[in-house]
Amino acid sequence: METVATIQTPTKLMNKENAEMILEKIVNHIAMYISDESIYSENNPEYIDFRNRYGDYRSLIIKSDHEFVKLCKDHAEKSSPETQQMIIKHIYEQYLIPVSEVLLKPIMSMGDIFTYNGCKDNEWMLEQLSTLNFNNLYTWNSCSIGNVTRLFYTFFSYLMKDKLNI
């Protein structure tokens, strides 16, 4: 029986425990997937097609950047507000800005761009995150990872909107 990360109401997603659980699972899976270089073989048609469409996005997200993985995992542990600020700012500056510019904007509709730029539609974002199925992560492909990266970006934007003046 498959288990979906079920949230009673969308607003409950933003409590500390649920937010950190989702963040940690997403980060762990992205790190695992991107570190498996065999998936990115020149003989893999799915990878070739994705790379031709969107470029080699791995270096924009994690690739072999252990600092990124460590910072994200640290975010899921108890840390001071100052440390969390540093983590969020690092992720925003080093990863989310280039991911948005290079990977996300070219594949977003105008409605998506409006939603992501201002996080205007928080209900939509919370609904998407609440339906992620963490039991079948091993079946996710490049497009799934790209879609989750979009949610990941939005999730951090939501967390940061009242914390940083960027």
UniProtKB/Swiss-Prot annotation:
Signal peptide: none
Location(s), subcellular: Host cytoplasm
Alphabetically ordered keywords of this record: Host cytoplasm, Lipoprotein, Myristate
GO cellular component, one term: host cell cytoplasm
PTM comment: Myristoylated.
Induction: Expressed in the intermediate phase of the viral replicative cycle.
Protein family according to the UniProt entry: Belongs to the orthopoxvirus OPG069 family.
Protein name: Protein OPG069
Organism: Monkeypox virus
